[in-house]
């Protein structure tokens, strides 16, 4: 099976609906055999990883972790859908404030753990 690259792709927010769909799409598009799934919510992340393992995608090296350093170290491509979910009673402004802090921390982590990253996409 041919892939576009052998470089590591990390999906941030992989336990969520968008992130888990991005992971499956990346696999089906044969982007890379080296896929790392990251989410701070470990139980949900494990469930997503197990679903992908059960699909039996050939030639894939799928790893998952709730450790941001492990997830980003060596990554050449990063796609992030990670952010706070909107809760009852929250305004868009409240959500923006929370997500701004998350985005700031994400940027610092990318700089620290994968300074040679080629592309970062934030959804």
What are these regions (language model features)?
Residues 6, 31-76, 84, 90:
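Conserved N-terminal Rossmann-fold NAD(P) cofactor-binding segment
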Residues 15:
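Conserved glycine-rich cofactor-binding loop
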Residues 19-20:
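N-terminal Rossmann-fold NAD(P) dinucleotide-binding loop
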Residues 23-24, 107:
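Generic hydrophobic/aromatic pocket-lining and core-packing "Φ" positions
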Residues 25-31:
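A short, Lys/Arg-enriched amphipathic alpha-helix followed by its capping loop at the start of a domain
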Residues 91-123:
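Rossmann-like NAD(P)(H) cofactor-binding subdomain of soluble oxidoreductases
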């Amino acid at each position: 099976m041919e892939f576009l690259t052998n470089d590591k792709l990390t999906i941030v927010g992989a336990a969520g609906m968008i992130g888990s769909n991005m992971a499956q799409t990346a696999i089906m598009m044969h982007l890379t055999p080296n896929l790392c799934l990251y989410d701070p919510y470990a139980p949900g992340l494990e469930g997503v990883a197990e679903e992908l393992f059960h699909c039996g995608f050939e030639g894939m090296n799928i790893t998952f972790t709730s450790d941001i350093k492990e997830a980003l170290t060596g990554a050449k491509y990063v796609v992030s859908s990670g952010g706070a979910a909107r809760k009852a009673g929250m305004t868009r402004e409240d959500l923006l404030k929370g997500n701004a802090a998350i985005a700031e921390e994400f940027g610092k982590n990318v700089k620290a753990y994968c300074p040679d990253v080629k592309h970062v996409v934030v959804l």
